[in-house]
A protein has these predicted regions:
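Secreted/periplasmic carbohydrate-active enzymes, especially glycoside hydrolases
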Residues: 1-190
Length: 190
């Protein structure tokens, strides 16, 4: 059971002023995730590594390079021979690429699986006007036993800053930035 109370909030500055909330506690949905000791840790849960880190180092309308780095940890008392299978699909669920890699992970260690698609043909480029999203489904196996799955989404795009023009360049085109600042805690502030 969790008790989340801030009964004494007016002695915690600046709560009395009402401009910003300095607090602790649960402010978002919470899930309890139970995994096998050989698993893909959530991002930031293991020395700021975890999950899947996807980049697109080379992008054009004809093809792109996609790099998928996935971290797998072994919390078992013995080493494990781990296979990572990654399936990349388009927004409709059609398989674009299948990747496989194996390595031994010693007990209590984390390993990085570095997988790449050097020539991803005819990518749908992500932009604010066309936010096309691909999926990466990662599966962790020891032997033939599926131990963990992890789903990531990503857009294929190039992003650069033009220092001469002081503008963002997205997929080779100048893109204007728009945004807001909003405090999620209080609808009447921000």
């Amino acid at each position: 059971a969790v008790q989340n109370s801030l009964d004494d909030k007016y002695r915690i500055p600046p709560m009395n002023a009402g401009n910003w909330a300095v607090y602790g506690g649960i402010v978002r949905d919470v899930r309890l995730v139970v995994t096998d000791p050989v698993n893909i840790p959530f991002q930031g849960s293991y020395k700021h590594e975890g999950g899947t880190f996807i980049t697109t180092p080379e992008v054009s309308a004809k093809q792109a390079a996609v790099r998928i780095r996935t971290y797998v940890q072994n919390q078992r008392p013995d080493a494990a021979e781990v296979t990572l299978r990654t399936v990349v699909t388009d927004a409709d669920g059609n398989v674009c690429e299948r990747l496989n890699a194996s390595q031994r992970i010693d007990a209590g260690q984390i390993a990085e699986f570095d997988q790449s698609i050097p020539k991803f043909r005819k990518p749908q480029l992500w932009s604010p006007d066309s936010p096309y999203i691909y999926n990466a489904y990662s599966e962790v196996y020891v032997g033939k036993e599926l131990l963990d799955t992890y789903h990531s989404t990503f857009g294929i795009r190039s992003v650069a800053w033009d220092y001469d023009l002081h503008r963002l360049v997205l997929n080779g085109k100048v893109t204007h930035l728009h945004g807001i600042n909003r405090h999620e805690e209080f609808p009447w502030l921000g």
